[in-house]
Amino acid sequence: MHEMSVALAVIDQVEQAAQQAGDVTAVRSVRLQVGELAGVVPDSLSFCFELACAGTVLEGADLVTEEVPGRARCAPCAREWSVGMPPRLSCPECGGARVDLLSGRELQIVSVHWEDGRTHAQTREPISEER
């Protein structure tokens, strides 16, 4: 299950950040951007996250996922569109196949909420191998 490896990577990054902060006793929530084209099922990720958090500083933490829609731009005519699922990667205007993906592959931690109430923005690179 791909989502389990993603959940473990998120937990590892948050645990490292918590260790660097020094005084964190519990993590309350993790906010994660998940692109529509990232190949991750948010419900499966939440399930895996809950299981993998057991016995860590993240035990009981909420995983809040924000879906980022897939968008593309046609190189020849500059038309932008939502690619949807399954992705439509040919231009609806001119039929061109030279497109740039503008969004939808994101898989990154946006913020972490510690028990002390402070919110810390992500300072690390996205965990996704799909850039």
Curated annotation (Swiss-Prot):
Keywords: Metal-binding, Nickel, Zinc. GO terms for molecular function: nickel cation binding; zinc ion binding. GO terms for biological process: protein maturation; protein modification process. Pfam families: HypA. InterPro entries: HypA/HybF (IPR000688). Ni(2+) binds at H2. PANTHER family: HYDROGENASE MATURATION FACTOR HYPA (PTHR34535:SF3). Belongs to the HypA/HybF family. This is Hydrogenase maturation factor HypA. It comes from Streptomyces avermitilis (strain ATCC 31267 / DSM 46492 / JCM 5070 / NBRC 14893 / NCIMB 12804 / NRRL 8165 / MA-4680). The lineage of its organism: Bacteria, Bacillati, Actinomycetota, Actinomycetes, Kitasatosporales.
